[in-house]
From Swiss-Prot:
Protein name as catalogued: Transcription elongation factor spt5
Bias (Low complexity) ranges: 960-974
Family: Belongs to the SPT5 family.
Biased composition annotated in UniProt, kind: Basic residues: 133-142
UniProt subcellular location: Nucleus
Gene Ontology cellular-component terms listed: chromatin; DSIF complex; nucleus
Main localization category: nucleus
Bias (Acidic residues) ranges: 97-130, 149-176
Sequence repeats: 818-826, 827-835, 836-844, 845-853, 854-862, 863-871, 872-880, 881-889, 890-898, 899-907, 908-916
Domain KOW: 471-498, 520-547, 727-754
GO biological process per UniProt: mRNA processing; regulation of DNA-templated transcription elongation; regulation of transcription by RNA polymerase II; transcription elongation by RNA polymerase II; transcription elongation-coupled chromatin remodeling
Length: 990
């Protein structure tokens, strides 16, 4: 039904109907708003009420000339009341037409008033909108999405009447008379009245409880959390548990980060981690802590995480949880001169001294003893070992890398983009990278920053030492050095925590805090170190400076400076360790000896024969050497003993007094050397005598004895023969037996015919040595010459004839050579078997009393002994008597007892015997040359022939040459192979 045409209506005639409709709509709207928080739901129960409320919100009064207050667009509702609404509108139209003319004048007058009121209302609405809060968004019924409940709005502005504004501002429910045509309002009103009565009948406490349950949890309180009682923050049995899980030391933070990443990855999956938190404490190494409801949740979170050991997890008790999570932040104020340590990097753990602080307090300029490898350019980078800490050396730095070296001042250098001043590395480091607590520097470390012990500030050192308060005992002599009573001294009477009760020298009892006291000592007191590096060391006080006490150590025999709080009075000066004393020579293992240079409470610091320094326990020492009469020779061959003052030849040139001598090593001591308390080791041949103990000036007689200095006498080396193929001496271990390098060991690397290239064990130096000057070491340790070494390598037995010289050339060192007048065992020798008799032996050939041998020519026709069956004549002669007509001569050639039988095999002699004596071409007996005898000639050959008969005298020289050097023992003459020729004997040469 279309009602868009504007109509002019009479206000008085239509006031009743319009006011009733407006009041009903306003009543429904107000009641629905004030009924309850869910009042909007009540209006949605009926579609018709929704239509009226919606049209009322979207419509406003318009100009009386253009639009009537009852001119409203209503869509078809769900209740089917369209016909009733049409009838009401038709009646209104008829009445309007009848009264149009009567109300024209009044409408014109009212039009101006309404415009003025409209302007005022617009101003008030603007003020309300600007001053009011944010408008609440209207709630819409989900069922209205299928209905057209919007009213058509005219182009002109609409405004509410004054009466409507007053109705909207009323607090109570205005009950107006409603016509019979307004259906459904009573039912809704009754429903609202019933709900109000129910709310009023409810008990106030019960209502408050309902509101508390409904809105209590969503309320938030804004306030200061510091006012919350601490007991409310303590964990209880309702809180999750904390599990301590063991892990690999140093991996605690990595494991916590791994768990965090795992939780983030599984957060939006079907199986997220069910743990609440995971954390670690730097002070509790080797553990991480996981907060969870169940232990299985912890195991699931740690599944697959490396370096975690979940076998024995520990449930942290509830009462220990606050201590575990408590963080006590201590702010340490750094001052210039304080000592700190580097946290990480190449200088991790090194001591540094604060030089200055930045303005923002985040960085500090520190001095560090540098660690520089000046040969780093020649080595591969990222070496596993870090260089030794020592002061900067500008000369070595310049030689190492001149391009990165520059001088900026007298003691200021720039090297490798790092600044060095007075030998120290000066560097700006963040304070977070420094360890400022528990530094505990030692005096040795501090002395590096004060090399001359000048201006040694132990007060700043005390600030860096953890637990800087002394431990006082009743009876200690103390002195007050802080506060109003500075300088007062006395004796401790009682100790109550940090409060010390002392009795002053005036007899007054004073209560002084322990931090203001220090122990007091006098010169000459025996003290004992009760804390620190030199704990349990004893000594006598020699110097006192404020809180610093210097005493002479009984074990180290040096002056040590410590804090007075670390000292206590000692009854005697006995050292704690008595098993071994300072400077004892001890045996560590089979090949290592060492000298003790420092004695601590449970350990010893020793230096071995190779210069290595180590710290050992008493159980690691095998024995103690007590050889006080050791003797050795120095570089010049002079005798050195314990107590002599010697000096190193080469190297650093250090000098000192000999403490011990062990084999080829000496242990020396020099009080002027601070390193290792002045103890060092060297080889005896690398030192030279400066002053001998007792002013010994006698020569070393051992060097004059060749048997002691050169070893056993060796025969001269024969001519070295050229070897074929690879020399067997290559790779052999040799010892030089003469020359400037005598006694050194080495290995042959290459050889020539006469020389060998030897790599010495000392210094790996390569030298060229003649082969005849070398002694070769066998597997048994025997030293042999080069010739014998080669022969043994070829399988030739020593003493046999060398095949290289042939069978005719004797070997001088062999006993079977022919002849040698100076050697009694050479040929001839009377008792050497079948050799020619010696020239001076009494048993000439044949001897006159040699049994049944061939009778001598002047033996008086003696017959061989009756029982000489095996003697000459021949072995098968049957003891025949010589021929009847031969006189004194040897029996006939064809007798059964020929001497020797021609076919007697190896009998003496036989012309065809391969081993004739002498052999025809081997080692012949020297012959007479030019009528004179020589001892070096060859043995006469067998090939001489007799020019006379057998019974005549033969004067041929080859057959009458006597044995060399023996004029009374002629050699038997040769015999011819012709018939009738037989051996014969001739008298000695005239």
């Amino acid at each position: 039904m279309d009602t868009n045409s504007p109509k002019s209506i009479d206000k008085d005639a239509n006031s009743t109907e319009v006011d009733a409709a407006e009041q009903d709509a306003a009543s429904v709207k107000i009641n629905s708003t004030r009924a309850s928080p869910n009042g909007s739901d009540l209006l949605n129960d009926d579609s018709e009420a929704a239509k009226i409320t919606t049209n009322e919100k979207q419509s406003s009064p318009v100009d009386s000339h253009n639009e009537s207050p009852n001119d409203t667009t209503i869509n078809k509702g769900e209740d089917g009341n369209e016909n009733e609404v049409d009838n009401v509108n038709n009646n209104d139209k008829k009445e309007d037409e009848d009264n149009v003319e009567e109300n024209e004048e009044e409408a014109d007058a009212n039009e101006e008033e309404e415009e003025d009121e409209e302007d005022d209302e617009e101003d008030e609405e603007d003020e309300d909108e600007s001053g009011g809060g944010r408008r609440k968004r209207a709630r819409h019924d989900r069922r209205n999405q299928f209905l057209d409940i919007e009213a058509e709005v005219d182009e002109d502005e609409e405004e509410l009447e004054d009466e409507e504004d007053e109705i909207g501002r009323e607090d109570g429910f205005i009950e107006e008379e409603v016509g019979a045509d307004y259906v459904g309002d009573d039912r809704r009103h009754r429903e609202l009245d019933r709900q109000r009565q129910e709310l009023q009948s409810v008990d106030a406490e019960r209502l408050a409880e309902e509101y508390r349950e409904k809105y209590g949890r969503s309320q938030t309180v804004v306030g200061d959390t510091s006012n919350v009682p601490q007991r409310l923050l303590l964990p209880s049995v309702n809180d999750p548990n904390i599990w301590a899980v063991r892990c690999k030391i140093g991996k605690e933070k990595d494991i916590v980060f791994t768990i965090m990443r795992k939780a983030m990855d599984l957060q939006y999956t079907s199986s997220p981690l069910e743990i609440i938190s995971a954390f670690q404490r730097d002070s509790l190494v080797g553990y991480i802590y996981v907060e969870a409801r169940k232990q299985s949740h912890v195991l699931d979170a740690l599944n697959g995480v490396l370096n975690v050991y979940t076998n024995n997890m520990i449930l942290v008790p509830i009462k220990e949880m606050p201590d575990l999570l408590k963080v006590q932040k201590q702010v340490v104020e750094l001052l210039p001169g304080a000592y700190v340590r580097i946290r990480r990097g190449k200088y991790a753990g090194d001591l540094a001294q604060v030089d200055n602080l930045s303005e923002n307090g985040l960085t500090a300029r520190v001095r560090i003893v540098p660690r520089i490898d000046y040969s780093d350019g020649l080595k591969r980078k990222n070496s596993a070992t870090r260089p030794q800490a020592r002061l900067f050396n500008e000369s070595e730095a310049f030689k190492s890398n001149p391009s990165k070296f520059s001088k900026r001042g007298p003691r200021l250098f720039l090297f490798n983009n790092e600044e060095f001043e007075d030998g120290f590395l000066v560097k700006d480091i963040r304070i977070s990278s420094l360890i400022t607590e528990g530094v505990n520097p030692t005096l040795d470390e501090v002395s590096k920053f004060n090399p001359n012990n000048e201006d040694l500030d132990l007060s700043s050192l005390a600030l860096s030492v953890k637990g800087g308060h002394a431990e006082f005992q009743p009876g200690d002599h103390v002195e007050v050095y802080v506060g109003e009573q500075t300088g007062v001294s006395g004796v401790v009477e009682n100790v109550r925590g940090s409060v010390i009760t002392m009795v002053s020298s005036d007899g007054l009892r004073l209560d002084v805090p322990s931090r203001g006291l220090r122990k007091r000592f006098r010169h000459g007191d025996y003290v004992k170190v009760i804390a620190g590096k030199y704990k349990d060391d004893t000594g006598m006080v020699v110097r006192i400076s404020k809180d610093e006490v210097t005493f002479l150590s009984d074990t180290l025999m040096t002056e040590l400076t410590v804090f007075s709080r670390d000292l206590g009075e000692a009854s005697s000066a006995q050292a704690v360790n008595s098993a071994y004393e300072l400077h004892d020579l001890v045996q560590l293992d089979v090949n290592t000896v060492a000298c003790i240079f420092s004695v601590d409470r449970d350990t010893y610091k020793v230096i071995d024969q190779n210069g290595g320094v180590r710290t050992v326990l008493a159980s690691q020492i095998t024995m103690r050497h007590s050889n006080r009469r050791g003797v050795a020779t120095d570089r010049n061959g002079a005798e050195i003993r314990i107590g002599d003052k010697v000096k190193e030849v080469g190297g650093e040139g250090k000098q000192g007094t000999i403490l011990h001598i062990y084999r080829a090593f000496v242990f020396l001591h020099n009080r002027d050397i601070a390193e290792n308390n002045g103890v060092f080791s060297a080889r005896s041949r690398n030192v030279a005598t400066i002053a001998a103990k007792g002013a010994r000036i006698s020569a070393d007689l051992t060097k004059m004895n060749p048997a002691l200095s050169n070893g056993p006498a060796l025969p001269p080396v024969a001519n070295l023969k050229r070897t074929i193929g690879r020399d067997k001496a290559i790779g052999a271990t040799v010892r030089i037996r003469r020359g400037p390098m005598k006694g050194l060991l080495g290995v042959i690397k290459d050889t020539t015919d006469a020389n060998a290239r030897v790599e010495l064990h000392t210094g790996n130096k390569m030298v060229t040595i003649p082969k005849e000057n070398l002694l070769y070491t066998t597997k048994t340790g025997e030293l042999i010459s080069y010739t014998e070494f080669i022969e043994r390598s070829r399988g030739i037995r020593p003493g046999s004839i060398s095949t290289a010289d042939g069978p005719n050339v004797p070997n001088w060192a062999q006993g079977a050579r022919t002849p040698a007048v100076a050697n009694g065992s050479r040929t001839p020798a009377w008792n050497t078997g079948s050799r020619t008799p010696a020239w001076n032996s009494g048993s000439k050939t044949p001897a006159w009393n040699s049994g049944s041998r061939t009778p001598a020519w002047n033996s008086g026709n003696k017959t061989p002994a009756w029982n000489a069956g095996s003697r000459t004549p021949a072995w098968n002669s049957g003891n025949k008597t010589p021929a009847w007509n031969v006189g004194n001569k040897t029996p006939a050639w064809n007798s059964g007892a020929k001497t020797p039988a021609w076919n007697a095999g190896n009998k003496t002699p036989s012309w065809n015997n391969g081993t004739k004596t002498p052999a025809w071409n081997a080692n012949q007996t020297p012959m007479v040359a030019n009528g004179t005898n020589t001892s070096w000639g060859q043995t006469p050959a067998y090939g001489g022939f007799s020019e006379t008969n057998w019974d005549t005298e033969d004067n041929s020289k080859p057959y009458t040459a006597p044995t060399p050097g023996a004029w009374a023992a002629p050699t038997p003459g040769g015999w011819d192979d012709e018939e009738g020729d037989s051996p014969k004997y001739v008298p000695p040469s005239p």
